[in-house]
Swiss-Prot record:
Keyword terms: Activator, ATP-binding, DNA-binding, Metal-binding, Nitrogen fixation, Nucleotide-binding, Plasmid, Transcription, Transcription regulation, Two-component regulatory system
Domain Sigma-54 factor interaction, chain residue ranges per copy: 229-457
Binding of ATP, residues: 257-264, 320-329
Organism: Rhizobium etli (strain ATCC 51251 / DSM 11541 / JCM 21823 / NBRC 15573 / CFN 42)
Inter-domain linker: region residues: 458-541
Protein name: Nif-specific regulatory protein
Record's subunit section: Interacts with sigma-54.
Pfam families, alphabetized: GAF, HTH_8, Sigma54_activat
Location of the DNA-binding region in this protein: 556-575
GO molecular function, one term: sequence-specific DNA binding
Length: 584
């Protein structure tokens, strides 16, 4: 597709000519980016994901209609997603936005701003378009969705024009451009998976499901297995499937998730499954070192570069040459160091501290963070260009509370490890499994491991029972590490409000119960109480079960996927809580 410089069109004005509207509150844009990031990381078909993005845009911008159009290799509309019109293919795409408008944005590669569509020839090419409102004046803003200077599609909004109010084009274009950058990476990932035969793009006949094949489903691939990764929940299998695909490439991966979800473990798995598996795997925690030391650790230093530099030393980039480098806690590095790191990532070259010789490095980069980088970018705490450089393939690791069905298998595996290390033969009773399955585990798998080890160490017999757990003896202090507050997410984890930590792995509007939904029904626990920090209340479990069943139309198999359980477990829980299944 040929790119041409932007040219004025009838009824459209260049961005600089339009009066700058009043600045929207930064918090609104941050919240919008945060919600959109949650939608984009959720497992769903591309057209469903894009329709959800438009719905979020509609809730954060005062617009009348919004649309995202994805173009195929020939530049023709392939998918059109709107908030109020079901997503469809090429024929409907031309009806959502005039083809001339799509072509103009794709050809120029620039935003298109039209203060009054009735005065623009671009909007008169097709009679009675669905966005027409008769004599009501409509303004339009559209931006391209780009990736590596290639146009993948467009994002556009329109609103009823109010001559008495300023036209906030500048702010809208900036916000939509940020959204377009996020959307472009999702489109590229879906297309990559499509080429791998994993997930057809735009396929209408398949129901909305994660890309992971369900065990035993006819005509579907069996779940992918990675050594050491335990669990069959849909949330975890989605991650495993994505990891198995991206590992075969050299694409930069951004692992996101709360502390204790296994980011370093998955980074190691990506390396072991990659063509670089026989080369070094080097890791560094960026938050553990001051900026000056961090620069020396990553880039190396020459002899005499600073006090104490008594010999030349290779940095982590050099040590990982030909292999994989994991930068953990990437969100904690300073803005000054971000610029230095960006240069190395862009050029593949570096100089040691105190040196002048340029060294070329070939490294596959994996970054990890539990920080909300979108909010950090909006707050000017994290460089946007570095964010786009490291977030080529973002993978959100689900917290343990989103896959409670995996807790029994995880606990038994951790106990087996403890037994081998200590020459013991301990087992869990059914009551012990029930206690762990009801715990919230804000520290995720790491906290579960600590719980298993502590309980196994103090167990009174070879069979661990419920009374052996610290929470049953008013000795569990985990609740002191988190508390409810007034934040949108409702709790504090790792010292941050949930809304400031990470996008969850599923959108609030999607089929699964996200972290925020679970947390909203959980109250802070008394550290001196008799139960685990959360989810110990039968009332809370019952409410969550009913909510999932209602979302699933009272179909147990669908509710099981929402809760990360098996249909048999859901059926048992329904009987246990004496919930009558509705016949719809």
């Amino acid at each position: 597709m040929t790119h041409m410089p932007a040219r004025p069109v009838d009824g459209a004005e260049p961005l600089s000519a339009l009066p700058a509207g009043p600045m929207r509150q930064a918090g609104t844009q941050r919240s919008g980016i945060y919600e959109i990031s949650k939608v984009l990381t959720a497992p769903a078909r591309l057209e469903i994901t894009l329709a959800n993005v438009v719905n979020v845009l509609s809730s954060f911008l005062q617009i009348r209609c919004g649309a995202i159009v994805v173009l195929d290799a020939e530049g023709q509309p392939e998918i059109a997603a709107t908030g109020d019109i079901p997503p469809s293919s090429q024929s409907a795409a031309r009806g959502v936005i005039p083809k001339a408008v799509i072509d103009h944005i794709a050809t120029t590669g620039m935003p298109l701003i039209v203060k009054d569509v009735s005065k623009s020839e671009l909007f008169q090419a097709e009679p009675q378009p669905p966005w027409s409102s008769g004599t009501v004046p409509i303004s339009f803003i559209g931006v391209p969705v780009k990736a590596d200077n290639k146009i993948l599609g467009t994002i556009s909004i329109d609103r009823v024009r109010n001559d008495a109010a300023p036209f906030p084009a500048d702010e809208d274009v900036r916000f939509l451009t940020m959204v377009a950058n996020l959307v472009s990476r999702t489109i590229r990932l879906h297309r990559f998976l499509n080429l791998e035969g994993r997930r057809p793009i735009g396929e209408q006949e398949r129901p909305e499901k994660p890309i992971i094949a369900q065990r035993g489903a006819p005509g579907r691939h069996p779940p992918v297995k990675i050594d050491g990764i335990i669990g069959d929940s849909p949330a975890l299998q989605q991650v495993v499937e994505t990891v198995s695909v991206v590992a075969r490439t050299n694409s930069t991966v951004l692992l996101r998730g709360e502390s204790g979800t296994g980011k370093e473990f998955f980074a190691q798995a990506i390396h072991e499954l990659s063509p670089r598996k026989n080369k070094p795997f080097v890791k560094l925690n960026c938050a553990a070192l001051p900026e000056g030391v961090l620069e020396s650790e990553l880039f190396g230093h020459e002899k005499g570069a600073f006090t104490g530099a008594i010999a030349q030393r290779a940095g982590r980039f050099e040590l990982a040459n030909g292999g994989t480098l994991l930068l953990d806690e990437i969100g904690e590095i300073s803005p000054a160091f971000q610029a230095k790191l960006l240069r190395v990532l862009q050029e593949g070259e570096l100089e040691r501290v105190g040196g002048t010789k340029t060294l070329a490095v070939d490294v596959r980069l994996i970054c990890a963070t539990n920080k909300n980088l979108e909010m950090a970018v909006a707050n000017a705490e994290f460089r946007a260009d570095l964010y786009y450089r490291i977030s080529v393939v973002p993978i959100v690791l689900p917290p343990l509370r989103e896959r409670p069905g995996d807790i029994p298998r995880l606990a038994n595996a951790l106990l087996d490890r403890f037994n081998k290390e200590n020459q013991r033969e301990l087992t869990f009773s059914s009551s012990a499994i029930e206690v762990m399955s009801q715990c919230y585990f804000p520290g995720n798998v790491r906290e579960l491991e600590n719980c298993v080890r502590r309980t196994a160490t103090l167990a009174r017999s070879s069979s661990i029972v419920s009374s052996d757990f610290a929470c049953k003896n008013s000795q569990c202090l985990s609740s002191l590490l988190w508390k409810t507050d007034g934040s949108p997410g409702g709790i504090t984890v790792d010292g941050h409000a949930r809304s400031n930590v990470m996008p969850t792995s599923s959108p609030r509007s999607g089929g699964s119960i996200g972290a925020s939904d679970e947390v909203s029904s959980v109250k802070a626990c008394d550290p001196h109480g008799s139960g685990c920090p959360a989810m110990e209340s039968r009332l809370t479990q019952r409410d969550r079960l009913i909510e999932a069943m209602e979302k699933a139309g009272w179909v147990q198999a669908k509710a099981a996927r929402i809760l990360g359980l098996t249909p048999r477990q859901v059926g048992y829980a329904l009987r246990q809580h004496r919930i009558e299944v509705k016949k719809l």
